[in-house]
Amino acid sequence: MNRSDVTDLIIEAKVTRGIAWAQVAERVGRSKEWTTAACLGQMAFDAAGARAVMELFGLPPEAEPWLREVPYKGSLPTQVPADPLIYRFYELISVYGTTFKALIHEEFGDGIMSAIDFRMDLQREPDPNGDRVRIEMSGKFLPYKTY
């Protein structure tokens, strides 16, 4: 068993049991965004979170160390994502990445937005022309240091 196998078991149980990510997050005691990332193999659960996920999804005991293992973050099966939804984010960064960089540097100076000290909130935004996806991202600004 490896982390990919555990992710497959989680997805299979989620589908067959009709579990929503928000339900998992409530059981784990974290946001739905962080919990979903952890279930999909991008974050590591603490012991209590791993136990809650194992119980909810009916995972075997050998899944626990994989749920708690620090993952290789940002790993996708291909360099350019093929999934249409994920590709839109890739496209968004390709088009607006330099704009994000310019505006962040103008506002904060030379540095980066942390993806470690980070929060995200995803909501449905009703719109008469078709519902919209609203994603709010908040990352700590980390200035580059001179030495």
Swiss-Prot record:
It is an enzyme of class 4 (lyase). Its EC number is 4.2.1.104. It comes from the Bacteria. Pfam families: Cyanate_lyase, CYNS_N. GO terms for biological process: cyanate metabolic process. It catalyses: cyanate + hydrogencarbonate + 3 H(+) = NH4(+) + 2 CO2. The active site is at residues 88, 91, 114. Gene3D superfamilies: Cyanate lyase, C-terminal domain, lambda repressor-like DNA-binding domains. GO terms for molecular function: cyanate hydratase activity; DNA binding. Catalyzes the reaction of cyanate with bicarbonate to produce ammonia and carbon dioxide. Belongs to the cyanase family. This is Cyanate hydratase. It comes from Cupriavidus necator (strain ATCC 17699 / DSM 428 / KCTC 22496 / NCIMB 10442 / H16 / Stanier 337). The gene is cynS.
